[in-house]
């Protein structure tokens, strides 16, 4: 199935008219949140950037600054995230995951494990342009051990291209993983890192099937038993992304909302970053794998303008 987003270019787009609508929504007493959210969720990211340009030209004001001063809370965070240029968004999230006192490994793991080599190469370039530092160096400075090594291997973006599959190599890799984990006292983490980080996606899918045949275990079960902490989370994220990126991100969204409290940072990040890439596919996987739809879960887990805007980005119910 081809990947598709839920947000596309608005037909008959008029950036100047949109800028005027937004100014009117924020001028004077009170703010017309409905106008803001209805307009921005129905425009693509490129169109939002154009609106911001027109806004500056017409009013001499910064649209994002105005939105920040008029909106509050989670709704403000969501709208500000939607206004970030798409090509900057992942780099921005990684920078913030690495900045300050603690490192947000969850964000590093999710983004670096689920982006394609092409996407990772683009992220590295944008990161350097925007922040004047090297993403790989920053990751190395903020992480350690095998977790760090796996991140660095993924950031090389040197995964083999998908070409004809060599059955003998599939067998060798599956055996090597079995010997590096289940058959060994201790674990040879290097072996997992090399195979998971450099083989092609279609090759690895076959390796996981072969591994099941040889060992009687799903590769995820072995990772669970043989590794722990950040490395375990990263290896699992890589395996899930190899199997299906939309399914991995659907699961990420599910656990961001399941149980008490909501991880709004993750909810916003995944919905915004994937809205023009594969959010439609994520929705389908969500419905297939969980007893509810993404739309219903957002509806039950959020409130107010924040909920309205997220549901519009989600783009519909899946019965």
Swiss-Prot record:
Superkingdom of the organism of origin: Eukaryota
N-acetylalanine modified-residue sites: 2
Motif [IL]-x-C-x-x-[DE] motif: positions: 312-318
Natural source organism: Mus musculus (Mouse)
Cellular component per GO, a single term: external side of plasma membrane
Subunit structure: Monomer. Binds ATRX and EIF5B.
Protein name as catalogued: Annexin A5
GO biological process: blood coagulation; negative regulation of coagulation
Post-translational modification: S-nitrosylation is induced by interferon-gamma and oxidatively-modified low-densitity lipoprotein (LDL(ox)) possibly implicating the iNOS-S100A8/9 transnitrosylase complex.
MF-aspect GO terms: calcium ion binding; calcium-dependent phospholipid binding; phosphatidylserine binding
Cross-link (Glycyl lysine isopeptide (Lys-Gly) (interchain with G-Cter in SUMO1)): 27
Keyword Phosphoprotein: yes
């Amino acid at each position: 199935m081809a990947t598709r987003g839920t947000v596309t270019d608005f037909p008959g787009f008029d950036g100047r008219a949109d800028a005027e609508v937004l100014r009117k929504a924020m001028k004077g007493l009170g703010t017309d949140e409905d106008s803001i959210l209805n307009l921005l969720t129905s425009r693509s990211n490129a169109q939002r950037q154009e609106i911001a340009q027109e806004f500056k030209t017409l009013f001499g004001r910064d649209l994002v600054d105005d939105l920040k001063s008029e909106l509050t809370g989670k709704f403000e965070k969501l709208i500000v995230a939607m206004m970030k240029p798409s090509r900057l968004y992942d780099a921005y999230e990684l920078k913030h995951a690495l900045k300050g006192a603690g490192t947000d490994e969850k964000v590093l793991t999710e983004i670096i494990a689920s982006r394609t080599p092409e996407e990772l190469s683009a992220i590295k370039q944008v990161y350097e342009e925007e922040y004047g530092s090297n993403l790989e160096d920053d990751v190395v400075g903020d992480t350690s051990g095998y977790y760090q090594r796996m991140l660095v291997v993924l950031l090389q973006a040197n995964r083999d291209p998908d070409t004809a599959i060599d059955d003998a190599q599939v067998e060798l890799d599956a055996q090597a993983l079995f010997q590096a984990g289940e058959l060994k006292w201790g674990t040879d983490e290097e072996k997992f890192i090399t195979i998971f980080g450099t083989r092609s996606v279609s090759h690895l899918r076959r390796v996981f099937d072969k591994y099941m045949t040889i060992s009687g275990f799903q590769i995820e079960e072995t990772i669970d038993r043989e590794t722990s902490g950040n490395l375990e989370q990263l290896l699992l994220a890589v395996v899930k992304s190899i199997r299906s990126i939309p399914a991995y991100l659907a699961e990420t969204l599910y656990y961001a909302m399941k149980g008490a409290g909501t991880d709004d940072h993750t909810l916003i990040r995944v919905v915004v970053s994937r809205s023009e890439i594969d959010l439609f596919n994520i929705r389908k996987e969500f419905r297939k794998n969980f007893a509810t739809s993404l739309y219903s879960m957002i509806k039950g887990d959020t409130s107010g303008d924040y909920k309205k805007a997220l549901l519009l980005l989600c783009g519909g119910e899946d019965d």
